[in-house]
UniProtKB/Swiss-Prot annotation:
It is linked to Cowden syndrome 4: A form of Cowden syndrome, a hamartomatous polyposis syndrome with age-related penetrance. Cowden syndrome is characterized by hamartomatous lesions affecting derivatives of ectodermal, mesodermal and endodermal layers, macrocephaly, facial trichilemmomas (benign tumors of the hair follicle infundibulum), acral keratoses, papillomatous papules, and elevated risk for development of several types of malignancy, particularly breast carcinoma in women and thyroid carcinoma in both men and women. Colon cancer and renal cell carcinoma have also been reported. One of its GO terms (molecular function) is DNA binding. Residues 8-50 bind DNA. DNA-binding protein involved in S phase checkpoint control-coupled apoptosis by mediating p53/TP53-induced apoptosis. Has the ability to inhibit DNA synthesis and S phase arrest coupled to apoptosis. Has affinity to both double- and single-stranded DNA. It is found in: Nucleus. Its main location: nucleus. This is Killin. GO terms for biological process: apoptotic process. Keywords: Apoptosis, Cell cycle, DNA-binding, Nucleus. One of its GO terms (cellular component) is nucleoplasm. The gene is KLLN. Induction: By p53/TP53; direct transcription target of p53/TP53.
Length: 178
């Protein structure tokens, strides 16, 4: 009795289904596809080969998975949270408390108690257009953050803090007050 060598496939099976001749090969109990569909086919003088259609390791969530950058995006507090204004994010609360200890002024204290004076209710144009804009903010999208959000290096030196005025005003109707 002739047995195939190690690693070779068993002879193909032919089945007639509704007038069509269906042929497939089986290796180790798994169905294989001919190279006409799965590979290069007859291009370049290749032999007729069979390709294993099993998925390789690590392809389970390759297409449908989305990586949520929760840790990355939580570094930058948004002007309006998704909870409807009931409570701000934990990062914003912690940063406001730290800011009030270093530079106690009424805007920071009011923002921590719940009054929404430090962060505006309206958004600038294009503030949340996608993940790319969070990492590369357009100069036209100014979030109007309060003075307590300035870098600590400016407040440690005791220098006069410059007034933040955007180059292109987000709100053309409002005029700067002198």
């Amino acid at each position: 009795m002739d047995r195939p060598g190690p690693g070779s496939a068993r002879p193909g099976r032919t089945v007639h289904v509704w007038g069509y001749r269906v042929e497939w090969k089986v290796r180790n109990g798994r169905k294989l596809q001919p190279s006409e569909w799965a590979g290069r086919g007859d291009l370049g003088g290749f032999k007729r080969r069979w390709k294993d259609t099993r998925a390789t390791v690590g392809t389970t969530f390759r297409r449908r998975s989305r990586v949520s950058l929760v840790g990355e995006l939580s570094k930058f507090p948004l002007p309006s949270d998704s909870s409807g204004g009931k409570s701000s994010s934990s990062f914003a609360r912690g940063a406001l408390a730290w800011c009030r200890q270093r530079n106690p002024n009424p805007s920071c204290a009011a923002a921590e108690t719940g009054a929404r004076t430090s962060l505006p209710k309206e958004r600038c144009r294009g503030w949340r257009l996608g993940n790319w804009l969070h990492k590369h903010p357009h100069p036209n999208t100014c979030p109007r953050l309060p003075a307590c959000w300035l870098p600590p290096i400016l407040t440690e030196r005791g220098e006069r803090v410059p007034k933040l005025v955007p180059l292109l005003a987000c709100y053309p109707k409002s005029k700067p007050k002198d």
